[in-house]
Amino acid sequence: LLILTEGFVTYGGLAGRDLEAMAQGFEEVVHEDYLAYRIRSVEYLGEKLLSVGIPIVEPPGGHAIYIDAAAFCPHIAVENFPGQAVVCGLYRTAGIRAVEIGSLMFGAGDARPLHHYLPVSGKRLEPARRLELVRLAIPRRVYTQSHIDYVVEAATDLYQRRGELRGLRIIFEPPVLRHFTARFEELP
């Protein structure tokens, strides 16, 4: 009976219900109608954001919209994390969770600021300042049209007040994967 609720050791630690949910997801995701609906929903969000002047990466993807945070907040220097400032602004404004993809995620800490490095060789790659994005991922089977419209309204409000956003300074960062648990303070 335990196998039915907790799964078997060969299930990779997943309960039977979780495996069933994954199987259902795999079944649904290959239906053409569903894919067209999903892609269109993301396109809709992108079109609405563009229509109010919010800069995004084009064309929209199939699962997310990427806001160009450097263009959204040109008054915030890269070293003060404009993407994270937008992420915090969206959360404070409307409870919308997003993720920064840029100098915070790909920076390497104070010893090697704002650059990409290969983890094993330490070879330096392109500067992270090329990427200052905010990802608005759209989970499957969760949001309706009105939810997407809410995101547009909140992002529009924040964009109109973007001059109020301030840069951030890291006050704590772990040695690895700093974007998950770093702590910040707003700059004056």
Regions found by a protein language model. Name each.
Residues 66, 99, 137:
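Residues in well-ordered beta-strands of folded domains
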Residues 70-98, 112-129:
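Active-site loop ensemble at the mouth of alpha/beta enzyme cores that anchors a bound cofactor
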Residues 29, 93, 105, 111-188:
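PLP-dependent enzyme catalytic core of the Aspartate aminotransferase-like
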Residues 44, 48-52, 85-96, 152-161:
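Generic non-transmembrane alpha-helical segments
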